[in-house]
Amino acid sequence: MPDVIPADSVGIVTPQIAQFDTPLALSCGQSLSSYQLIYETYGTLNQSASNAILICHALSGDHHAAGYHAMSDSKPGWWDTAIGPGKAIDTNKFFVIALNNLGGCCGSTGPTSINPETGQRWEASFPIVTVEDWVESQARLADLLGIQTFAAIVGGSLGGMQVLEWSIRFPTRLQSAVIVASAPKLSTQNIAFNEVARQSIRRDPDFFDGNYIDNNSVPTNGLGLARMLGHITYLSDDAMGAKFGRQMRHDSYQYNYGIEFEVESYLRYQGEAFTKRFDANTYMLMTKALDYFDPASQTNGDLSAVLSRAQCEFLLVSFTTDWRFSPERSEEIVNALVKAGKSVSYAKIEATEGHDAFLFPIPRYMTVLNTFLTRVANRLTTEIK
Amino acid sequence: MRSDLEIIDEWVQPNIRVLDLACGPGELLHHLIKNKQVNGYGLEIGHDDLNICIEKGIPVLEQNIDEGLQNFDDQSFDLVLMTHALQQFRRPDLLIDEMLRIGKECIITFPNFGHWRSRLHLALKGRMPVSDFLPYNWYDTPNIHFFTFQDFERLCKEKNIKVLRWAAVDGQLKDHWWIRSMPNLFSETAIFHISR
């Protein structure tokens, strides 16, 4: 809880809701006749509407990327370390938009929303949405806000996939793309992890084939287990070792299945805390969006061919201990962009935090991000002059 | 701009694809992108240099050249450059092979250890030369291979590498007739334009 709002915070922010009544055709063949997107904005849009940055969130992110909703909030938004006045994504220079993606559970239309056609909650019947669908819906939000071209679109992990899709689908609608700790498609191992996460949810007897709210139930065990698994893969072996080692709960072994090691307690806590703020159907949808993303499939697996459509400048960032989206995966994108002759810079940041590093204010990471975006901002001001 | 870079600039055709290995703060690449409209990329591992490149808008990739260049396809660049860096890599001979695999042509510049002052320093003082241009001690120098103008020429001959042209300049990076006539003795920086 902040006693006072820090000087480099965007302060108290209020989410807004955009209503869309033009049907959105989805990759799966279904369409959404109407839907809502919840979003927040930080900073001021300039007169030519050229200084907007779109933030794309990852698996469990939402529209609350920076600042506080109330003075009683225990924590600021999920990327507050990077977004704010004077920060890497400088709200003195940019108008920053963060939204909750379709299928989410934080205010945008998703499985917990009411299906207007039935008057019932969507739950299991909510169609599977893809990265492509998200980007389409984000473009409509941009239209609504009067933004033709983004100065930059920024995202980490699954968010980075959305940025990549933007660069291919709407090449003239962004000047620069920042893709952090991401990949051009999931590896087999990553799909496998997602399947274990989904199975742990689906096999929870409280899941009721996805219609758990109707059954006054919450699949906390399954969702918690999925989050525990995810959490292990977001951290590096070293980071976990440094944090917990073999620290014990008791002075000696208890020889039972209670908590012996502190890491067990930590994981259980993380799993349980997650079930209080996240919806299991949304989690399943997000993992499917990850699995399906593969823009190179449009060009017979040739990533550089599909990226030849892009026109923006790219910055790619990876982290040395990230094994869920390893530096090699970012380098696949880098190499394809070089092959296609696109403007790209790439930084491989030394970090101990594993995949989670993309959420940490690692000094060199923030410097690289800030340097790249400062140039984007400077170019905007020279263009206006 | 350093005059060895000016010489390179004269040799580079406009609108080509250029890869600059160990590009440092991107001085040459910046110039080539602005004035020759090349599609250029730099490789670098120095954090400050990388940042300067990003600041200037020079496409730069953080990649350790000693760990290989397999990510670049055969003949995928018109020109591969390396200025004042070849002496810093583990296997300069294999690196030249790689450069010629990736690039149709290469331009390499290096400090000529056969310069008379280096020879005199070693001959009279009996100690490894330390100069303004190579200001390191033997134990902390990043320059782990020292070679001369002639050594490089010989390597090219052994590998059947064509020397398209060369230049040799002194400490002030000026071109004089005596340097041109005896480059191994008088040049401090050698510049080679090579191909297969």
From Swiss-Prot, chain A:
Q: Where in the cell is it found?
A: Cytoplasm
What are the entry keywords?
Acyltransferase, Amino-acid biosynthesis, Cytoplasm, Methionine biosynthesis, Transferase
Reaction(s) catalyzed by this protein? L-homoserine + succinyl-CoA = O-succinyl-L-homoserine + CoA
Query: Which residues are named in the active-site annotation?
Result: S157 (nucleophile), D322, H355
Instruction: List each copy of the AB hydrolase-1 domain by range.
Output: 51-359
Q: What is its EC number?
A: 2.3.1.46
Q: Which HAMAP family match?
A: MetX_acyltransf
Q: Any idea what this protein is called?
A: Homoserine O-succinyltransferase
Its organism's taxonomic lineage begins at: Bacteria, Pseudomonadati, Pseudomonadota, Gammaproteobacteria, Oceanospirillales
